[in-house]
């Protein structure tokens, strides 16, 4: 990673730890000489320079510590002791959770580099007379804030965002460029929504209507909305449909990657993480603290209990009532071999009957 701050703004290591929200991490600095370097950025063990801090969270990279040029390295106590025994003179930040400390410090550097958007409403934005823009909020160029909408204290809307009628954006939330919130969408505090995300479009609701013709469909108006909790992150071009009657609900702390499709009436429990290209069909309920791998697909009207991990690419077609990891992906192979195996799979029911007949003979 490139140096993020110039030397005049780089904090000393102890000051960085004070600024970087180390609450609950029990960090200690171990400097053989007592000197504390200035830290201007974060890097990997292989790439960090003399004013950057690096971290070791995966033991397979421990050999890189000996050759790193980093000003300091975040390590666990046992690693620090082992490296000192080998004669290392590096400055260590000793912490039980190096990866989490790295994340906290990266958050601080990101905020320092990016800064806060200017408070106020850009002249090109269109804000309804009865919309509320709270103190410290920022409404960027070409934004539209519709009637009855509210933008919370310290929240920011990037260029081209649309906040529909009666929708709300919570305090200190950030909508990147071109995010669309339809009417009746409520986003909690400290949320991050990336470009192109659309919240509150109509769910896919249609009723067979023979009065319109054979095989015709009549639209079911989607009367619910979308509720997004606090500390949620939603990736680029992800869509969350509004509920048919009740709201589609995304719980506190949920993390959604890019290009996810969440259908109407879905409920996702707190602190669940969903990777890219997942599809969740209507009225499915996913519990708390679940992890969903990329490109997994959920049928509608399912119930997934808390603490479930779904492997990438898995089709989930029935409810899950027991915590654990579930995988339903047929492994890839050379195409010709796959064709031969596929032909066998089509005959599994017949083969099963034949085996049973042989067992009874």
Curated annotation (Swiss-Prot):
Gene Ontology biological-process entries: lipid A biosynthetic process
Enzyme Commission numbers on file: 2.3.1.191
GO MF terms, alphabetically ordered: N-acyltransferase activity
Gene3D superfamilies, sorted: Hexapeptide repeat proteins, MurE/MurF, N-terminal domain
InterPro entries the record matches: Hexapep, Hexapep_transf_CS, LpxD, Trimer_LpxA-like_sf, UDP_GlcNAc_AcTrfase_non-rep
Role noted for this protein: Catalyzes the N-acylation of UDP-3-O-acylglucosamine using 3-hydroxyacyl-ACP as the acyl donor. Is involved in the biosynthesis of lipid A, a phosphorylated glycolipid that anchors the lipopolysaccharide to the outer membrane of the cell.
Active site: 264 (proton acceptor)
Protein name: UDP-3-O-acylglucosamine N-acyltransferase
Reactions catalysed according to its record: a UDP-3-O-[(3R)-3-hydroxyacyl]-alpha-D-glucosamine + a (3R)-hydroxyacyl-[ACP] = a UDP-2-N,3-O-bis[(3R)-3-hydroxyacyl]-alpha-D-glucosamine + holo-[ACP] + H(+)
Keyword set includes Repeat: yes
Domain of life, source organism: Bacteria
SUPFAM superfamilies, per the entry: Trimeric LpxA-like enzymes
GO cellular component: membrane
Pathway(s) annotated for this protein in UniProt: Bacterial outer membrane biogenesis; LPS lipid A biosynthesis
Gene: lpxD
HAMAP family in UniProt: LpxD
Record family assignment: Belongs to the transferase hexapeptide repeat family. LpxD subfamily.
Family annotation (PROSITE patterns): HEXAPEP_TRANSFERASES (PS00101)
Subunit structure: Homotrimer.
Database matches in Pfam families: Hexapep (PF00132), LpxD (PF04613)
Swiss-Prot/TrEMBL keywords: Acyltransferase, Lipid A biosynthesis, Lipid biosynthesis, Lipid metabolism, Repeat, Transferase
Membrane among keywords: no
Organism: Bordetella avium (strain 197N)
């Amino acid at each position: 990673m490139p140096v993020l701050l110039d030397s005049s703004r780089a904090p000393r290591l102890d000051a960085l730890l004070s600024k970087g929200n180390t609450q609950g991490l029990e960090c200690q600095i171990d400097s053989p000489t007592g000197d504390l370097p200035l830290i201007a950025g974060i890097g990997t063990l292989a790439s960090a320079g003399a004013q950057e801090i690096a971290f070791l969270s995966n033991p397979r990279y421990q050999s890189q510590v000996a050759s790193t040029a980093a000003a300091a390295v975040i390590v666990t106590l046992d690693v620090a002791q082992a490296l000192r025994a080998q004669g290392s003179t590096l400055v260590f930040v000793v912490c039980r959770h190096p990866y989490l400390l790295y994340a906290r410090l990266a958050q601080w550097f990101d905020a320092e580099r990016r800064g806060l958007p200017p408070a106020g409403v850009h002249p090109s934005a269109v804000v309804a007379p009865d919309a509320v823009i709270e103190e410290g909020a920022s409404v960027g160029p070409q934004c539209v804030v519709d009637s009855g909408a509210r933008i919370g204290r310290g929240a920011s809307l990037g260029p081209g965002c649309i906040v529909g009628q009666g929708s709300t954006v919570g305090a200190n939330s950030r909508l990147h460029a071109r995010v669309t919130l339809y009417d009746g969408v409520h986003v909690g505090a400290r949320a991050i929504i990336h470009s192109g995300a659309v919240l509150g479009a109509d769910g896919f609701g249609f009723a067979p209507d023979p009065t319109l013709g054979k095989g015709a469909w009549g639209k079911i108006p989607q009367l619910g909305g979308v509720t997004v909790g606090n500390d949620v992150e939603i990736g680029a071009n992800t869509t969350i449909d509004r509920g048919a009657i009740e709201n589609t609900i995304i719980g506190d702390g949920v993390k959604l990657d890019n290009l996810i499709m969440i259908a109407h009436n879905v409920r996702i429990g707190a602190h669940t993480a969903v990777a890219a290209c997942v599809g969740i069909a209507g009225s499915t309920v996913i519990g708390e603290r679940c992890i969903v791998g990329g490109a997994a697909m959920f049928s509608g009207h399912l119930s997934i209990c808390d603490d479930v991990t779904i492997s990438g690419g898995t089709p989930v077609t029935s409810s899950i009532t027991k915590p654990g990891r579930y995988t339903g992906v047929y492994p890839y192979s050379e195409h010709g071999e796959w064709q031969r195996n596929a032909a066998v799979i089509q005959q599994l029911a017949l083969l099963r009957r034949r085996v049973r007949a042989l067992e009874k003979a």
